[in-house]
Amino acid sequence: MAVGKNKRLSKGKKGLKKKAVDPFARKEWFDIKAPSTFENRNVGKTLINKSTGLKNAADGLKGRVFEVCLADLQGSEDHSYRKVKLRVDEVQGKNLLTNFHGLDFTSDKLRSLVRKWQSLVEANVTVKTADDYVLRVFAIAFTKRQANQVKKTTYAQSSKLREVRKKMIEIMQREVSNVTLAQLTSKLIPEVIGREIEKSTQSILPLQNIHIRKVKLLKQPKFDLGSLLALHGEGSTEEKGKKVSSGFKDVVLETV
């Protein structure tokens, strides 16, 4: 048997080992600032590669979307089941000025609402705000037992559900089309639209657990720096925003 060099064996590296480079040495951190609509404006931090040559770090940050729990923005665990999307529209030094980009429910909250013996009502509508943002708004509601009801189930007739759905769409169109995006955000936090739907549909069907479960941004107008700076307040350095008051007391809803 011929004795020779086994080519399959790995060769030894010549010279010294390469020095390990810290990947974070080429990156820089930026502070994310929420609009003054929310009570806590310091969302967190994000990083990006430093500006080099013709490549500007600010260009890579604009349009970046962050998903934040509303409980962190409002400082209250009552909003822990809702998630807010914030989009970076402008970079000022080390601060990223964001704007509202959408709203959603956590999946565990949605699953906890669906129960036996009741009817589910869902409605959605595409509507334009007063400042030309095109949104698709989704609402959800459930039937509940009437006072002194003996029957176990609370299923509703299809005709009644259609009436309720029509009323929900009317209210969502009215409440969204007459306000700006910032004013709409102030309505969504205390769930004003859900309470308005509950009040208006009492004559048709008694409802419970009425929520605007999702808001999706479809189209936005041409970027206006002045309106964004006004949304963040002068200088955009304040850590606290304006507290949104619901004007309502929590009502314990009747369960099935």
Curated annotation (Swiss-Prot):
Source domain of life: Eukaryota
Entry GO MF terms: structural constituent of ribosome
PROSITE patterns: RIBOSOMAL_S3AE (PS01191)
Modified residues (N-acetylalanine): A2
InterPro entries: Ribosomal_eS1, Ribosomal_eS1_CS, Ribosomal_eS1_euk
Keywords assigned: Acetylation, Cytoplasm, Ribonucleoprotein, Ribosomal protein
Organism: Clavispora lusitaniae (strain ATCC 42720)
GO annotation, cellular component aspect: cytosolic small ribosomal subunit
Claim: Kinase is one of the keywords in the record: no
Descriptive protein name: Small ribosomal subunit protein eS1A
Location(s), subcellular: Cytoplasm
Biological processes per GO annotation: translation
Subunit record text: Component of the small ribosomal subunit. Mature ribosomes consist of a small (40S) and a large (60S) subunit. The 40S subunit contains about 33 different proteins and 1 molecule of RNA (18S). The 60S subunit contains about 49 different proteins and 3 molecules of RNA (25S, 5.8S and 5S).
Family, as annotated: Belongs to the eukaryotic ribosomal protein eS1 family.
PANTHER family (alphabetical): 40S RIBOSOMAL PROTEIN S3A
